[in-house]
Amino acid sequence: MNQWQLSYQSPVELTEHLRKSYWAYDAKEKSATKMAFDQDVNLIWVGDTYGRVSSYDPSYSLYTRHTAHIGAEPVVELLSHKQGVLSLGGESLNFANRRSVTKLHVTSADIAQLCDMRAMCYGSNSQNTVYCGGTNLASGLVAVDLVKGRLSNTVQYSSKVKLMQSSNRLMAVARQNGMLDLLDPNSNTVVKTFSGHSCMVSSMDFRDHTLVTAGKSKRFNMMYPDQFVNVYDLRIMKQLPPISFSKNTEYMGNGACYMVGADFVQLHPILPTVVVIGSVTGAFDFVDLSNPTVRTQYCHPCQSVTQLQLSPSGDYIAFIEHDNNINMWSRSNGMTGFTSTATTILEYPDYPDDGILAGATSIDDYSYPLSSVGLPYYNEKLLSAWHQTVFRSDGTIPMKVPLPPKSSAASSSHTALSTSSDSRPNTARSGNPSSGGQKYRLLPYDRHKYGHRNVAVPYRSLRERKKKLLITDEDGKDKQELMNYKPSNDREVPPAFTKLQMVYGRFGVQDFDFKAFNKTRYSGLETDIDNVYTNAVLQMYRFVPEVYNFLVSCLKMENFSDNSLLTELGSLYDMMVRANGEICRSSNFQEALASIPKSYLLGLITDSIDNALEPNTTVSGTSISDSDASGSSMTAKLESMVLGDDKTTISCHDNNDNSLTTPQKFNTFLLNRLLFEELQMKINTTQSIVLEELLGIDVQVTTRSISPCANFTRRSDIIPVLTVTSPISNNIKYVNKKLNNQTILPYIESSMSRLKHTKAMCEKCFKCETVESEKTVRNLPPLLSLNISLTSDEWATAKTVRGWLTKEFYATISKDRPILKLQPTDLKTTNAIFKYELNGYVARICDYITEPHLVAYSKIFDPTTRTYKWYMFNDFLVQEVDEEEALNISYWWKTPEIAIYSDAEELTKPFVPASFYTINYSILYRDHFANGMRESIKKEYRLLTAEEAPKPGSLVALDAEFVALSEDQVEISCKGTKTLIKPAKTALARVSVLRGEGDLAGVPFIDDYIVNTKHIEDYLTKYSGIEPGDLDPDTSSKPLVTRRVVLRKIWLLLQLGCIFVGHGLYNDFRNINIHVPKEQTRDTALYYLQGRRYLSLRYLAYALLDKDIQKGNHDSIEDAYTALVLYRKYLDLREKGIFETVLNRIYEEGRASNYRVPGDLQ
């Protein structure tokens, strides 16, 4: 492979089209992400970070460009097709011909599994099916039929996908952990797995029976490219000896010399034994696989390379450089173009002849196209381009066009068709005119639905907004502005409703001023967690008295399951009451939620609240809605729902969950899970199921066949959540009724009595007949949990009704059907009448700057004033609001999603604390290991005895150690300034608690290691003392317990009134996720002068106790004991009145040694 030379063509920048003035303030990266040669014509396809796909000819002249992915979604993969090009984004797949005309475009709205995609490849040489894979474990590998434009197949695949390639009958899938799988697309099974690279696969190529890969390994906490390229022979399914990259290629930088590894690898398309190996430094080799010593080396002159591609003819190599310029190498002779089989001729536009017309054209000649009349050139600004401030107009609203008269028969026929074919009207679902003969019509601009029109949104600096979250002015005006919850105009969202982001300072989260966002005694929740959207739902149920009392009462019993939402939610609510307005976290609850497999299948493990199941899709698992047609018992339904029993497949057309948002699906899943866990807890007792009595809605499902056989079935189900939809979609009788002046009551009442006609196969006569299905609620539980699922058009109508979300109503059961009215006098019945009041609701907030998020409203009884007050919870911002503002949903940016109505008597019940119940303390006096008792366990503690039972005020010394599950997320500005976006995710690894008083003072009675089977990024051995294998239940010799066991021990000590002594207890308790009041903590960080640095435990022990601790790795028992001795020293210095003098001396001496002990200086 000699005689290669750099092309004479001048490099061309590929991102020139992204450097527009209107993107000047866009911080999104503007770069080329993917490059591919066309297999049939002389074109190069390039995708960028804004979803554009461009094609260039051999002279780098632009041929076509089109937007393949909407919403500035980056292009992650390109594939050449015989009819055009395939482009893959994170949540969409685009297929366009070479003239940039879209032939197929599917998104996650069409195929729900199309989420977080990273790679794709063809399933066969026919190129009719393409397989896509990504990082979403619930999606697996998605096969899309390019001919029919729909989902063809789904392959179950439990690993995150990095790269995909196909050849002959197999597909090669590279995982993100460096492993390689060979997949048979005919049987959808993995036929072989190879251990590719230790960390990741960076490049891969697959041709005939040869597979080559280049990857990276981790050394010294850094990723370095491997020096060798792996080669696999798939005829014998074995790995061949690896091929080394250029041994004499080195890279000089920062005064050091580094060996260059392989970053790119590609097989030659013509010569089957030749492979091209390249590096980001520009070096590339041609190597003969049959004789690796035969190689030709070249080096591309540039700073770095981001993409390398070999043309189908094998005569060109294209490079994309670090500055997004494209450059090319070629052979000096025998060149045939990019492809040697060019059979397709490129099409170019036809240019009209602008010559003199043969003759004048009559103005009445309708056959003459107006598009052929040219426009004159202009050198002044057109009126249509003038700024909106010149006219100050919102634009002209088109007048309504009267519809032609339509017969009642046609109307009823169209209505019946729409109602029977779907649970929603056709126009509401698609926005297209219906097929019942209705004419097209112009609709007026809906300001309530779309907000203000034709108004330029002023630029607002996000950097200044972040500064306001961290820095408070002397007069506090910045924070006062952020607490404003009333809108100043109808265009902007009030500051209190914006999506909040925690800003980390020098000392992490301790610098954040949470108190400025909450002046109440009700705690907010941090946003530094996964699934942050759940905060609003948890806050709503926190202030439902009976739900709170039941969950907290469950803490009296032992439950050591790590996936118990019942226990974690009770602990969270107990912590929020104990915090009394201070910030809390729901991290333990999120850990339990993530440990339930069904939460992934439902898409609940996400920070986005936009994804919802779409119609015409199939979902595995038993339905979770009130229209489940499985006919199973309550226990079987709950087990299928929360445990992930996927034996049944139900179409979304059979339930009402096809339009539920992620928060609504989480609401349904949460209540079903809590019901299931309570049922499991009381399965061998005669106790009643409390949550079923509170939330259980008895739904009677009656199905009858409108045919001569008259088949009839009836069953009953218990559901905890009612999905509220429009009356028009629930019953035919509401079709001709207007809802302009109706509150939510007709929506609820019609959702409690649904009637639908469908075409189905009769189970008795086996004929396709019209089946009438009626679902009726037979009871009125004390709590009504509602998922409000309306279309955009239905919300536009509801927002115009004042008081649509009514604060109270009266209900009764009459003739086995619920009736809801605003006044009790409107209920003409002698049956019992129940009064319901709105307890709270969750609303979606949409603004111009950030993605949608949730806030919660709760109605709380104030015992001091004996009145109810409304509070708004926006994560850690808590604000009291007036009732009128809380119930106002007319704003375009606020839409209710979940609401809960409580019986008026339930709402007045008090919140009972955990201390009211008789608590089981036995775990403090015994062991409960995660994997049973073992003789090899090394115990360094002595259990408490009944005589040593802690009392209020008893001193205990505590220290906790953690391991890192992920690294810090840091943002680096153009000036080199680093900003911590999200700190590293940690996991509790070890907890040691020592006696603080008595004859055994300083002797530990708890020294538990917490079992961890997840991936650990860093054991932090130097600071935690945890070695690899210490937390593995199969290899560890430590006393391993589950996370819930150690949390209960600490919680019990807190309940007993113990005083905790330690160093840096704030961070320990925050990461453990438990709140301990300040009066129960004694932190040795009190050795601190205001405005000066904090002193480490090691330096304090040396300066005050003359002890050299932490010589090797940290030991939590030693650290807890040292903190206990330091606290006693503090009390002694306070008693003598010399504490301030000694503290000043410590700071003065420490300044000379930079606060280090002599051992550290050496």
From Swiss-Prot:
WD repeats lie at residues 27-66, 153-193, 196-233, 300-339. Keywords: Cytoplasm, Exonuclease, Hydrolase, Metal-binding, mRNA processing, Nuclease, Repeat, WD repeat. It is found in: Cytoplasm. Residues 424-437 have a biased composition (Polar residues). Its cofactor is a divalent metal cation. Residues 956-1126 form the Exonuclease domain. Belongs to the peptidase C19 family. PAN2 subfamily. Forms a heterotrimer with an asymmetric homodimer of the regulatory subunit PAN3 to form the poly(A)-nuclease (PAN) deadenylation complex. Catalytic subunit of the poly(A)-nuclease (PAN) deadenylation complex, one of two cytoplasmic mRNA deadenylases involved in mRNA turnover. PAN specifically shortens poly(A) tails of RNA and the activity is stimulated by poly(A)-binding protein PAB1. PAN deadenylation is followed by rapid degradation of the shortened mRNA tails by the CCR4-NOT complex. Deadenylated mRNAs are then degraded by two alternative mechanisms, namely exosome-mediated 3'-5' exonucleolytic degradation, or deadenylation-dependent mRNA decaping and subsequent 5'-3' exonucleolytic degradation by XRN1. This is PAN2-PAN3 deadenylation complex catalytic subunit PAN2. It comes from Eremothecium gossypii (strain ATCC 10895 / CBS 109.51 / FGSC 9923 / NRRL Y-1056) (Yeast).
